[in-house]
Amino acid sequence: MISVRRGFSQLWYWGKRGVIGIIALWMAGILIFAFLPVPFSMVMIERQLGAWLTGDFAYVAHSDWVPMDEISPYMVLAVMAAEDQKFPDHWGFDVGAIESALSHNQRNQKRIRGASTLSQQTAKNVFLWDGRSWVRKGLEVGLTAGIELIWTKRRILTVYLNIAEFGNGIFGVEAAARHFFNKPASKLSASEAALLAAVLPNPLRFKVNAPSGYVISRQQWILRQMHQLGGKTFLQENTLD
């Protein structure tokens, strides 16, 4: 009995140290990535390991980091129009969108609607595994609060655009722009930016180079939203500092 208790005690001891260590790494990551490029995300690691485990050794999760000044303002506007129109104003969470999603999901459990802001998506993509568990969601909330506290809105959006998945092995807007349009991210047009933003909900299902009717209709909706937000004037009025 004593040996069993001792075993549980040691397990609890090392478990606590492990949790504290992971939290410390996350905190260090938030501080470091406030200034330095993010070399890879948890999503990239997950995709790469998944490919290797299935024998696909040709797969390479690829991203080319670029600063915000080298990203088309249309791309910046497109992701906000598509994913999070209140991004310049909220503190990491869109309470209205969360309430709306909860109400929708209670009525229609077969088609779950999300309400994650760009800040939440950035925290999840950089630091967490994929999934819908309450544990992961709780960690996402804490990490989102951390990056909102330490990073500027401009930094959050810069990281998001550099790690977002746009296709099989294609991460970041620079890699996506060169792969799909043979141009740098700085030269993306409004239509091209809207098309890239249209596949963000599921870039492995929706294709930029072979858009379905749904993707095309979503692209047109995003273009309308970009116009309604005020176009480039919206970015000038919201400096994202």
Curated annotation (Swiss-Prot):
Transmembrane segment boundaries: 18-38
Disulfide bonds, paired cysteine numbers: none
Cellular component terms (Gene Ontology): peptidoglycan-based cell wall; plasma membrane
Single GO MF annotation: pentosyltransferase activity
Reactions catalysed: [GlcNAc-(1->4)-Mur2Ac(oyl-L-Ala-gamma-D-Glu-L-Lys-D-Ala-D-Ala)](n)-di-trans,octa-cis-undecaprenyl diphosphate + beta-D-GlcNAc-(1->4)-Mur2Ac(oyl-L-Ala-gamma-D-Glu-L-Lys-D-Ala-D-Ala)-di-trans,octa-cis-undecaprenyl diphosphate = [GlcNAc-(1->4)-Mur2Ac(oyl-L-Ala-gamma-D-Glu-L-Lys-D-Ala-D-Ala)](n+1)-di-trans,octa-cis-undecaprenyl diphosphate + di-trans,octa-cis-undecaprenyl diphosphate + H(+)
Known EC number: 2.4.99.28
N-terminal signal peptide: none
InterPro entries in the cross-refs: Glyco_trans_51, Lysozyme-like_dom_sf, PBP_transglycosylase, Pep_trsgly
Membrane topology: Single-pass membrane protein
UniProt KW Cell inner membrane keyword: yes
Protein localization: Cell inner membrane
Pfam families listed in its UniProt record: Transgly
SUPFAM superfamilies: Lysozyme-like
GO terms (BP aspect): cell wall organization; peptidoglycan biosynthetic process; regulation of cell shape
Keywords: Cell inner membrane, Cell membrane, Cell shape, Cell wall biogenesis/degradation, Glycosyltransferase, Membrane, Peptidoglycan synthesis, Transferase, Transmembrane, Transmembrane helix
Keyword set includes Glycosyltransferase: yes
Pathway involvement of the protein, from the record: Cell wall biogenesis; peptidoglycan biosynthesis
Function in brief: Peptidoglycan polymerase that catalyzes glycan chain elongation from lipid-linked precursors.
Family per record: Belongs to the glycosyltransferase 51 family.
Name recorded for this polypeptide: Biosynthetic peptidoglycan transglycosylase
